[in-house]
């Protein structure tokens, strides 16, 4: 059930679902697994807010276990395409593809709540048991290319070398907010609501 908020206007009461009300304040909630429908919704909201006023920041709150690489990269590409700065605020967890999205916020405007966590690891995927040998080679090549792309993005977003990212992402690498700050994926740990 999606909560509804009621506002008093000069014409009486007006009700909004909570996400529509947050959108009026340029807040987008990226929660749950990253998949195509969710990504399309996030992208549409980013484009709408940028078209409305590209001089104001957009606030993207992130709490996701990760998910589809192609859907996540579509969000990242849109964040980079629009003129509005996108502030990212991690609450709960930014794992896997979520780290790519959250760390791609505007430099100096990437935040994390004190008890949130970050996870980097290599992309998952593979060929099913009914896959032909030649298709397995194609899948393996695509997976390596995807890993290289994601490692380059993480290196650019953190200031670490691609080699360091490759080493750290070999296995699940969990980070606290403080560790994420020291690693370079965020710019500040938020102790209170100090967004401007």
UniProtKB/Swiss-Prot annotation:
Group of enzyme by EC: hydrolase
PROSITE patterns recorded: CLP_PROTEASE_HIS, CLP_PROTEASE_SER
Active site positions, chain numbering: 96, 121
Enzyme Commission number, as recorded: 3.4.21.92
Catalysis: reaction(s): Hydrolysis of proteins to small peptides in the presence of ATP and magnesium. alpha-casein is the usual test substrate. In the absence of ATP, only oligopeptides shorter than five residues are hydrolyzed (such as succinyl-Leu-Tyr-|-NHMec, and Leu-Tyr-Leu-|-Tyr-Trp, in which cleavage of the -Tyr-|-Leu- and -Tyr-|-Trp bonds also occurs)
Signal peptide: none
Pfam families: CLP_protease (PF00574)
A GO biological-process term: protein quality control for misfolded or incompletely synthesized proteins
InterPro entries (UniProt xref): ClpP (IPR001907), ClpP/crotonase-like_dom_sf (IPR029045), ClpP/TepA (IPR023562), ClpP_His_AS (IPR033135), ClpP_Ser_AS (IPR018215)
Residue intervals passing through the bilayer: none
Superkingdom of source: Bacteria
GO MF term list: ATP-dependent peptidase activity; ATPase binding; serine-type endopeptidase activity
Family affiliation: Belongs to the peptidase S14 family.
Function: Cleaves peptides in various proteins in a process that requires ATP hydrolysis. Has a chymotrypsin-like activity. Plays a major role in the degradation of misfolded proteins.
Name of the protein in its database record: ATP-dependent Clp protease proteolytic subunit
Source organism: Streptococcus sanguinis (strain SK36)
Organismal lineage: Bacteria, Bacillati, Bacillota, Bacilli, Lactobacillales
């Amino acid at each position: 059930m999606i909560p509804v908020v009621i506002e008093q206007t000069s014409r009486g009461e007006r009700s909004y679902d909570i996400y529509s009300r947050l959108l009026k304040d340029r807040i987008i909630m990226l929660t749950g697994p990253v998949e195509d429908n969710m990504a399309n919704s996030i992208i549409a909201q980013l484009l709408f807010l940028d078209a409305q006023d590209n001089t104001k920041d957009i606030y993207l709150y992130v709490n996701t276990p990760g998910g589809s690489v192609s859907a996540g990269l579509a969000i990242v590409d849109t964040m980079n395409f629009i003129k509005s700065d996108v502030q990212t605020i991690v609450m709960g967890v930014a794992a896997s593809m979520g780290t790519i999205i959250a760390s791609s916020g505007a430099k100096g405007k990437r935040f994390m709540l004190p008890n949130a966590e970050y996870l980097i690891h290599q992309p998952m995927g593979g060929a099913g048991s009914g896959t032909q040998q030649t298709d397995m080679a194609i899948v393996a090549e695509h997976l390596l290319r995807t890993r290289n792309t994601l490692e380059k993005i993480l290196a650019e977003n953190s200031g670490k070398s691609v080699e360091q990212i490759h080493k750290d992402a070999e296995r699940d690498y969990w980070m606290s907010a403080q560790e994420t700050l020291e690693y370079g994926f965020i710019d500040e740990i938020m102790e209170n609501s100090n967004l401007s």
